[in-house]
């Protein structure tokens, strides 16, 4: 048990709380401590009965059963893997900026969920984070099952198809990818490549709550230092030297 505790404490803070909630809320529903009916994002209950917790619980809840258990575990792995990589990579030392990214993506997903009657938001939020990581590491070569290798920029779409095969919904993954693209476009692509203004800015109260642990933040519309160094070394193309790809299931 001490090994599990040490591993859990080694997870970066924001990812650790997100991971724990995504385990705890389905467990509470599975044990019947609270009816899962209270966890879904039902527009009528949220908008007219003022059950304001539903957007939060719908983000963490997933109905785990014989037909959905593998899909749940795979996406829980994606949450741990890519949220950890972002929080300790592009957002290293900047927890407020990382939390703001999650909040921005979450708000967009909640609005979309209410408009499209999406009752569960766990997979879209995970996919949005995975998409941002894939774009920041777009030329890294990653390995997937059966020895397939491809650039990271294609990973969100490969996983979209993979989740569909194992019982997921294309809509959930697609919404997550689109929200991740919106964040990446507004924070990086539009200011950097198109010379536009910065539309996203982390609120100051988040910096007061979660101060940066080191100076020289990347800032919105400016690529992280690792991204800039890789671009300089590779002339803007080729395989980035930001770490090794991984095979799904590797530790």
Curated annotation (Swiss-Prot):
GO biological process: cellular response to misfolded protein; endoplasmic reticulum unfolded protein response; ERAD pathway; positive regulation of protein ubiquitination; proteasome-mediated ubiquitin-dependent protein catabolic process; protein destabilization; retrograde protein transport, ER to cytosol
UniProt KW keywords: Acetylation, Endoplasmic reticulum, Membrane, Phosphoprotein, Protein transport, Transmembrane, Transmembrane helix, Transport, Unfolded protein response
Chain positions found as Phosphothreonine: 202
Residue ranges annotated as Lumenal topological domain: 32-69, 116-122, 167-170
All ranges on the Cytoplasmic side of the membrane: 2-15, 90-94, 138-154, 190-251
Family matches, as InterPro entries: DER1, Rhomboid-like_sf
Modification sites for Phosphoserine: 201, 226
Segments for region (Disordered): 229-251
Localization per record: Endoplasmic reticulum membrane
The organism's place on the tree of life at top rank: Eukaryota
Transmembrane segments: 16-31, 70-89, 95-115, 123-137, 155-166, 171-189
Motif SHP-box, residue range(s) on this chain: 241-248
Pfam family, one: DER1
Molecular-function GO terms, alphabetical: ATPase binding; identical protein binding; MHC class I protein binding; signal recognition particle binding; ubiquitin protein ligase binding; ubiquitin-specific protease binding
Modification type N-acetylserine: residues: 2
Membrane topology: Multi-pass membrane protein
Cellular component GO terms held in the UniProt record: Derlin-1 retrotranslocation complex; Derlin-1-VIMP complex; early endosome; endoplasmic reticulum membrane; endoplasmic reticulum quality control compartment; late endosome
PANTHER family hit by this protein: DER1-LIKE PROTEIN, DERLIN
Family affiliation: Belongs to the derlin family.
Known role: Functional component of endoplasmic reticulum-associated degradation (ERAD) for misfolded lumenal proteins. Forms homotetramers which encircle a large channel traversing the endoplasmic reticulum (ER) membrane. This allows the retrotranslocation of misfolded proteins from the ER into the cytosol where they are ubiquitinated and degraded by the proteasome. The channel has a lateral gate within the membrane which provides direct access to membrane proteins with no need to reenter the ER lumen first. May mediate the interaction between VCP and the misfolded protein.
Complex and partners: Homotetramer. The four subunits of the tetramer are arranged in a twofold symmetry. Forms homo- and heterooligomers with DERL2 and DERL3; binding to DERL3 is poorer than that between DERL2 and DERL3. Interacts (via SHP-box motif) with VCP. Interacts with AMFR, SELENOS, SEL1L, SELENOK and SYVN1, as well as with SEL1L-SYVN1 and VCP-SELENOS protein complexes; this interaction is weaker than that observed between DERL2 and these complexes. Interacts with NGLY1 and YOD1. Does not bind to EDEM1. Interacts with DNAJB9. Interacts with RNF103. Interacts with HM13.
Protein name: Derlin-1
UniProt organism field: Bos taurus (Bovine)
